[in-house]
Amino acid sequence: TPEEEQYVHMHSVTECIARIIPAERLAEADEVRDNLNYEDIFPYIYLEDGLVEFLELLAGRGIRMAVHTNRTNTTERLLRHFEIDRFFAPVVNAGSLKRPKPDPEGVHYILNAWGLPTETVAYIGDSALDERSAGAAGVTFWSYKNPALAAAMFVPDFDTLRSCLAGIAAPVPGRTAEEPDLS
């Protein structure tokens, strides 16, 4: 159903399996999952248009980027497959947290790793769980491709966001990457 599709887009694989697989088939689903070769799936996954250029713009401006996802053990492999892993640190997935999104634990972990206050960070996400996680952490939320979310900014695509951010001045000499200027 559309509701199940929306649910599995946002939640961890463990939560999704528990919701959509009948209880009497959970062991079978776990066995399939344990034996799945994700490398076979990667050719069917694609990057959003403009993503790499956007990441390069941010990196060139000294703006830090992280991943906060409800994926579990495939995130790093997926980032490496697309050769974009160099842009993100830390990478926080549901398997590394006590409480996945929408709990703010992952956002707090990123802020602590960077040593940054909430007011210097924007969280770009596409789901209600992203919106809730950012809100619970006190971080500005920008909605990607989802105008139904309550966000400080709606981003229809990465090219549009790149154009918006292109006007931000290059890093000021003496300013570190830990002090991005998003104002």
Please annotate each region the language model reported.
Residues T1-R61:
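N-terminal helical cap/lid subdomain that shapes the substrate entry/recognition surface
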Residues V52, E56-I63, T72, E76-S183:
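Asp-based, Mg2+/Mn2+-dependent phosphohydrolase catalytic module
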Residues H68-T69:
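Conserved phosphate-coupling serine/threonine residues in phosphotransfer and NTP-handling enzymes
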